């Protein structure tokens, strides 16, 4: 067991404070590293908005939780949750709240962007609404270039060296987002950040975005959704554990 000692030091305001030392590693250093780690991992800018958005998405059935009767994704994964945020466009109050929160957080996190880009097809509608709220140009990015006409992958006018904030409706593995970002960069855009309505917080997505140095935030995410669902008794605590197990290894999970 390492010995514990106490030292004194003076802070920036001239106050004397005690610093506990374990061997050569100070507790204050451990605390600093922990805070930095938590900050890096956090993709939620406003916890209140995160819960509110999750609540709204559940109320309009954009998010469905079925731990006992799982859905099947296009990838073949079995999932106790299904999320279709495009439904929000059919509810004026909900889409207005989402649009306004996107605009506030974009201005807070990214300053003044030049262009808003939506990832097709799910984020075309909400992306255009956000661009309207911010009075900015809008473009959207297809998964791949069209095979006819002008053969565009990016629809709309995008000049070189524009500061672009990318909008997604939903982030799972991150592949579609990064494909869109790649196309935007190849067109000369500078990516300021990526924002989504909802993020599953899969580890594979975090690794991919970190590798590409993409600044990512979401209005809501899986963790806030589960917390809200438990608080409002939408699910039992035992079902919440099933949801957490699925998120930890969605490709291996079995109901």
Name each model-derived stretch.
Residues 24, 31-34, 38-42:
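Short, positively charged and aromatic/hydrophobic N-terminal segments
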Residues 43-111:
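Active-site-facing substrate-recognition patch
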Residues 44-59, 182-255:
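PRPP-dependent phosphoribosyltransferase catalytic core
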Residues 111-120, 195:
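Short glycine-rich phosphate-binding loop at a beta-alpha junction
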Residues 114, 162, 192:
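Conserved acidic residues
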Residues 127-165, 173-179:
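Short, glycine/charge-rich flexible loops or terminal/linker lids adjacent to PRPP-binding catalytic cores
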């Amino acid at each position: 067991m390492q010995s514990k000692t106490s030292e004194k030091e003076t802070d920036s305001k001239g106050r004397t404070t005690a610093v506990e030392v374990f061997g050569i590693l100070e507790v204050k250093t451990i605390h600093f590293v922990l805070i930095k780690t938590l900050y890096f991992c956090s993709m939620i800018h406003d916890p209140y908005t995160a819960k509110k958005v999750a609540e709204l998405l559940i109320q309009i059935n954009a998010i469905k939780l079925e731990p006992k009767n799982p859905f099947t994704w296009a990838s073949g994964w079995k999932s106790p949750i299904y999320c279709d945020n495009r439904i929000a466009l059919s509810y004026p109050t909900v889409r207005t709240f989402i649009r306004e929160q996107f605009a506030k957080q974009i201005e807070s996190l990214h300053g003044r962007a030049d262009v808003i880009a939506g990832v097709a097809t799910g984020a075309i509608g909400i992306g255009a609404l956000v661009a309207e709220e911010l009075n900015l140009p809008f473009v959207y990015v297809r998964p791949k270039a069209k095979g006819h006409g002008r053969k565009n992958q990016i629809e709309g006018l995008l000049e070189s060296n524009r500061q672009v904030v990318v909008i997604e409706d939903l982030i799972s593995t991150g592949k579609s987002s990064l494909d869109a970002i790649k196309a935007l960069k190849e067109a000369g855009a500078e990516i300021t950040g990526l924002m989504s309505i909802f993020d599953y917080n899969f580890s594979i997505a975090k690794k991919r975005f970190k590798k590409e140095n993409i600044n990512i935030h979401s209005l809501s995410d899986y963790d806030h959704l589960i917390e809200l669902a438990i608080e409002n008794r939408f699910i039992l605590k035992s079902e919440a554990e099933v949801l957490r197990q699925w998120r930890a290894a969605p490709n291996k999970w079995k109901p």
